[in-house]
Amino acid sequence: MQEFDKSISFDGRDIRLKLGLLAPQAGGSVLIQSGDTAVLVTATRATGREGIDFLPLTVDYEERLYAAGRIPGGFLRREGRPPEKAILISRLIDRPLRPLFPQWLRDDIQIIATTLSMDEEVPPDVLAVTGASIAVIAARIPFFGPMAAVRVGLIGDDFIINPTYREIEIGDLDLVVAGSPDGVVMVEAGANQLPEQDIIEAIDFGYEAVRDLIQAQRDVMEALDIPLVIGEPPAVNEVLQSFISDRASESIKKVLMQYNLDKNARDEQLDEIKETAITNAIAELPEEDPVKVAATEEPKAVSNLYKDLTKKLMRSQIITDGVRVDGRKLDEVRPISSRVCLLPRRVHGSALFARGLTQVLSLATLGTPGDAQDLADDLHPEDEKRYLHHYNFPPFSVGETKPLRSPGRREIGHGALAERAITPILPPQEEFPYVIRVVSEVLSSNGSTSMGSVCGSTLALMDAGVPITKPVSGAAMGLIKEGDEVRILTDIQGIEDFLGDMDFKVAGTDSGITALQMDMKITGLSMEIVAKAIEQALPARLHILDKMMETLSTPRKNLSPYAPRLLTMKIDPEQIGLVIGPGGKTIKGITEQTGSKIDIADDGTVTIAALEAEKAEKAKQIIYNMTRKLNEGEVYMGRVTRIIQIGAFVEVLPGKEGMIHISQLAEGRVGKVEDEVAVGDEVIVKVREIDAKGRLNLTRLGIHPDEAAAARKAVAPV
């Protein structure tokens, strides 16, 4: 491809596209740049494997620390496994791309986005999403594009397209909208309890900007004479399709209308129909029968056509009758139950949330500031994270046996969504300095486990005594669209997710939305349908919230006795070195002496943690005494540390030592210092003078008995 360089003026910033310059052996590549952030996106296609019945699409987002002029840490000094942020961006690219590939496509497709340069203003993620569309089109891969993405922020009453990191931080909305010529294909958002109407307006605002980027891609395609390839789907074997439909349709309808069946019973009956009415019937046919010939030539065609028939009949039942496979109305939520304090209080907070056959156990743990997740080797400006949400999806939750692996992209993505939903209602760090981790264990899955983990986490946090500002609930919305007929489903279960067109997760409080995530299986939705789905989610969320509040309506007043007790104090940042000591000797001594854990921030904030409040208070007193300013005339109890000919040195506070001249040891003449004090003696002294160099001159003379008594009882203020 010839080199092509084009700048697009986009909402006050330039987006620069360079094609044909880098990665010439990739199927298609583009260097997309805004500000000093530049991302190389490549798309490569290879012949698919024989016999597969899915699209083998792989999307990877890669970060290199050289992009920010940094060298990785660790012994190897090179990047290791992708950080969580990179995995989430990989998903962000994948989700709007996947529904735009033809359903019949079976070629291997690999898309790699690599951030080559990054500034402190422009996030690379939405650039990578738009760049992926350009790379796919340049590679002549069948694709219902173009597709583009923008970020929408909200500062005050004004929406902003592609806000900077700083604008995202201070704003009330972080929304990514991706769209195609057919409409919105993906939404991802975190919000500060925004009303539904504000979210709808933001998505509409973002999609208008997406349309401009789609047109810009069309201009590039025209300039380079790159056609948009769609391709032709393979012909359906009508003989086999008719045989399956004739044999199984009525039986499938009967199963779909048995509303009392649970997921497993329904699946068993559908499998039995396939086995008896289709597989066994084909096996009994003569070898030369066209149906048997077709089934032999395409072994997976029977399963795929049976699945398509089941999908068609379920969707028809919803469109025509307005009834779902479990008998619910379109806007009805499944039965809900929840419990808290399910486990002993060694687990700081626990909650079990169930919605239908979906069951999630959420467990909250309170930690110290030192437990925060360090993001130092991440390209993004966030240094650490004080709220962590981890989501686990074991195979037994769907009745399967599989090897256990480290968390996959789905688990990481669902955990991040729940984390985003909860973060806006957490107390400020100044009021509640704990680091909080919630783990959601999916014990049974039949749809909407991510929103189940949001609900369970809210209850677990309240059970742990975290003073959240408001409880959060969530619901997953679905869609069945056949031509102009549209049905939006509330609280979708597994089969509706699998056979439907949309999975739209909405989480929030009774005041507004805190998180959104919409994924499509069709090529786009109108804003009218998007708005209706968001509005229909509101009564469902509030209903779920009411059910949760019946279990636990407010956070517990007391923490678990096994949660650490935290105390905070401020010291002069210049005194941090004094508290830490050479090689950490001083702070290590304090922790060993008091049985506490101490964290010191760069601004001088000291956080002390211990299982017993008394131990934390003791450590606080020691640090207070070490760092407090001494004044002339103050009286202290100190310890004699050494003796010289002209006097004795006394440690009045940890790390603060002064000298009592021999003339100040006692009334009258003192012959030898040893006649009055010995090393290790505890003595009451007064600060007589602090000289220009900060040295303390002490005395034992002129101390009132009340002052001496107070010094013996002195403690650090709380």
From Swiss-Prot:
InterPro entries: ExoRNase_PH_dom1, ExoRNase_PH_dom2, ExoRNase_PH_dom2_sf, KH_dom, KH_dom_type_1, KH_dom_type_1_sf, NA-bd_OB-fold, PNPase. It catalyses: RNA(n+1) + phosphate = RNA(n) + a ribonucleoside 5'-diphosphate. It is found in: Cytoplasm. Mg(2+) binds at D497, D503. Residues 564-623 form the KH domain. Residues 633-701 form the S1 motif domain. Disulfide bonds: none annotated. One of its GO terms (cellular component) is cytosol. Keywords: Cytoplasm, Magnesium, Metal-binding, Nucleotidyltransferase, RNA-binding, Transferase. One of its GO terms (biological process) is RNA processing. Pfam families: KH_1 (PF00013), PNPase (PF03726), RNase_PH (PF01138), RNase_PH_C (PF03725), S1 (PF00575). It comes from the Bacteria. Its cofactor is Mg(2+). GO terms for molecular function: 3'-5'-RNA exonuclease activity; magnesium ion binding; polyribonucleotide nucleotidyltransferase activity; RNA binding. Its EC number is 2.7.7.8. Its main location: cytoplasm. Belongs to the polyribonucleotide nucleotidyltransferase family. HAMAP family: PNPase (MF_01595). Involved in mRNA degradation. Catalyzes the phosphorolysis of single-stranded polyribonucleotides processively in the 3'- to 5'-direction. NCBIfam families: polynuc_phos, PRK11824.1. This is Polyribonucleotide nucleotidyltransferase. It comes from Rippkaea orientalis (strain PCC 8801 / RF-1) (Cyanothece sp. (strain PCC 8801)). The gene is pnp.
